[in-house]
Amino acid sequence: PTQQNPIHISCSCLMDASKTPIFWMLTITFFICGLSSTGIVGQHFIPFCSDNNVGAVVAASYLALMGIFNFLGTLGSGWLSDRFNNYNLLAIYYGLRGLSLIWLPYSDFDVFSLTLWAIFFGLDFIATVPPTVRLAGNFFGPIKGPIVFGWIFASHQFGSAVAAFAAGETRDSVLTYLPAFVVAGASCFIAVMLIIPFRKHKPVTA
């Protein structure tokens, strides 16, 4: 395989993976991951805070705090992914993320609530990546797994783009970010429902 055209290898892996339910589950949930993280929070958290009388510099500080706990959360998620059921972890991560996104618009946007949110959401921000990578490796093998994850990651970026655009359009139309954040949070619960049927799914490739 190393002597083949890399584009052919990549497309061949995609064709094979697209015939499996696990690929579509991971692809759709990772689309939701991008939508509910970098797409809406990465692009719209600061202007959302500005709409609630929180200065841009202060809001950016909360975003930086979120980044610190994102680092810790990702490390912790990697450790957990080596030891526990990755489906359960993903379901928990998406569920908690959904709750935090829905809670934010109804918070007071004061120091306590924004600090609490930044820590909580930060721990969950990239936590979905380690179990997603591990599941891709488990099901598609050490050679195809990374390539398949590359395609799955493309859906993450597409989800980010959709949320970045749609949340901005919604804000301009209804003059509030509340619907966008609630919809993003609700989408996380869709991810949970997609994951649950796979909890006892076994790898089909070595």
Predicted features, each with a name:
Residues C49-S50, L80-S81, A166-L175:
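Interfacial helix-cap and linker-helix signal at transmembrane-aqueous boundaries
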